[in-house]
Amino acid sequence: MIFKQIRRLIAAALLAALSLPAAAQPLRQLVNVEGIRDNQLIGYGIVVGLDGTGDNSQVKFSGQSVANMLKQFGLKMPEKTDTRVKNVAAVMVSASLPPGYSRGQTIDVTVSSLGDAKSLRGGTLLLTQLKAANGEVYALAQGSVVIGGLSAQGKSGSSVTVNTPTAGRIPNGASIEREIPSDFEQGDSIRLSLRRPSFETATNVVRAINRNYGKIATTRNATTIEVRAPGDPTERVAFVARLEKMNVDVGAEIPRVVFNSRTGTVVISEGVTVRPAAVSHGSLRVVISESSQVSQPGPFSNGTTQVVPDSRVQVEQGQGRMFKWPAGASLRAIIDTVNRTGATPDDVMAILQALDQAGAIDGELVVI
């Protein structure tokens, strides 16, 4: 009798937990305000002051850039003069211009080698124009490049490279010269775009706004929500600030399994389960080895030494394994079981894809 009561209490607790609403999140984490976004800038420039690690003679455009720069300062080089030097590197400069930034403010820039420079460490980016997609100049970049990697090479040709020495950043390296206009202040309404489109989330956002401010929010699809806003710019900014603090129930999200095919990383969201399934998986490995045999002719035979290539191909068939799981098994437990058998990331991915094709995964499989 006591055990029956305990089982009833446990079942009631589980039902209560399942009936709880999804965790509410601030609206600022769910939506973007239309017209308030970053704008990408890009430019071409040169980095000088390198310790012999710049572009080699095969890169012609870096030498041409040096000649054009000297010409702007009134220095005309003789015709057919080779202006390619190893302490200069041609680079592409990119930056992200946040919304609302005004003239005189600074932003970080990323500097990346365009030629065959070995390292940008110790270099200085000369004044570079940063343009948007419309071709207009919005910022000017210049400064010392900060590199997180290194590269060293000995006289024998041996070298070592840590991280990426051909790309770096310049903190606060660009000054804003032109503001990007925004349509945030225009019209009698604002638009909110869900970062992850969902009909349920869009409906919950509209209900939450209308519950607090009256019938001012509408939606037509799973992404865009239109909200009537004050016409005065100061009041509109304060209104959006209040909206961003409002908590909204996002609803139930689709369970996902994300697999990175390059690194073998598997990320499993909460709620992913597997239906009854059995999987048999075997591994096939092909090994190709190359070696060279030297054929030496006999003395006084007027023959020549020949190098004969020798290729060996081996095919190894691994022992197949059978896996069987009951209904409702956690996918995390399944992957742990497969990993304990010594399976590689490719094996895990093959099993996940097979389960997904069989309709055994209660969730969405995403491969990146």
From Swiss-Prot:
Keyword set includes Signal: yes
Compartment list: Periplasm; Bacterial flagellum basal body
Main location: periplasm
Entry keyword set: Bacterial flagellum, Periplasm, Signal
N-terminal signal peptide: 1-24
GO cellular component terms, semicolon-separated: bacterial-type flagellum basal body, distal rod, P ring; outer membrane-bounded periplasmic space
Stretches that traverse the bilayer: none
BP term (GO), one: bacterial-type flagellum-dependent cell motility
Pfam families (UniProt xref): FlgI
Source superkingdom: Bacteria
GO terms, molecular function: structural molecule activity
Subunit text: The basal body constitutes a major portion of the flagellar organelle and consists of four rings (L,P,S, and M) mounted on a central rod.
Job of this protein: Assembles around the rod to form the L-ring and probably protects the motor/basal body from shearing forces during rotation.
Entry's family note: Belongs to the FlgI family.
Name of the protein: Flagellar P-ring protein 1
